[in-house]
Amino acid sequence: MIVGVLVAAATPIISSASATPANIAGMVVFIDPGHNGANDASIGRQVPTGRGGTKNCQASGTSTNSGYPEHTFTWETGLRLRAALNALGVRTALSRGNDNALGPCVDERANMANALRPNAIVSLHADGGPASGRGFHVNYSAPPLNAIQAGPSVQFARIMRDQLQASGIPKANYIGQDGLYGRSDLAGLNLAQYPSILVELGNMKNPADSALMESAEGRQKYANALVRGVAGFLATQGQAR
């Protein structure tokens, strides 16, 4: 699998994510499965935050209590999302090409995304919060650093929030507000020049969330909700570039 290369399905086949808008074929989505399949000391290298500071190149991520890692969850869910979008005629690219090696730093991922001039950028993650905390939250850059972050990115976050909730995935009860969280510390969002969100799909330390994440059926449920959110946003963006 080649990182950053646009891929589209040869024969569009509508996935289980039904009622998807029909005018999104040819649009471009950059998918960032958060974290790396492997890590070493290089992930501590300092890179720009997009707000004048620096932060680590990458974080190692979290895991469920049984040891299922965040990086594998985001990878497997990201592949499902990619397949569903390709089946709808959407062109996609991934930030990393495998789940067993070092991946690009957070600023490099943002630069890769911006270079594609995508209609949407979605970064997939899972939180490591308190065991009592359950549910997803959708992050966006705040305060915004450009007009895209101020408008379309927030719209994207709200549409994704609504579709996740409509799919039966609960909003976070321990962080953010009403399933949304405006943040200034996420480099990928700060550096984005195109509509961009980071979705924490659930809390890996919560028994109910982790059970969903650890099952293939659960990952498909997340992917189906994600494709509805992405497609719903794309439908508001006019024609493909």
UniProtKB/Swiss-Prot annotation:
Pfam families: Amidase_3. Disulfide oxidation is not required for folding of the enzyme core or in vitro muramyl dipeptide hydrolysis. InterPro entries: MurNAc-LAA_cat (IPR002508), N-acetylmuramoyl_amidase_3 (IPR050695). Its EC number is 3.5.1.28. Cell-wall hydrolase that hydrolyzes the amide bond between N-acetylmuramic acid and L-alanine in cell-wall glycopeptides. Is able to hydrolyze the cell walls of several bacterial species (i.e. Paenibacillus sp., B.avium, E.coli DH5alpha, E.aerogenes, L.acidophilus, B.thuringiensis, B.pumilus, B.subtilis and E.coli W3110), thereby showing that it is a cell-wall hydrolase with broad-spectrum activity. May have a role in peptidoglycan fragment recycling. Coiled coil: none annotated. The lineage of its organism: Bacteria, Bacillati, Actinomycetota, Actinomycetes, Mycobacteriales. Residues 29-230 form the MurNAc-LAA domain. It comes from the Bacteria. Disulfide bonds join C57-C105. Zn(2+) binds at H35, E70, H125. This is N-acetylmuramoyl-L-alanine amidase Rv3717. One of its GO terms (cellular component) is outer membrane-bounded periplasmic space.
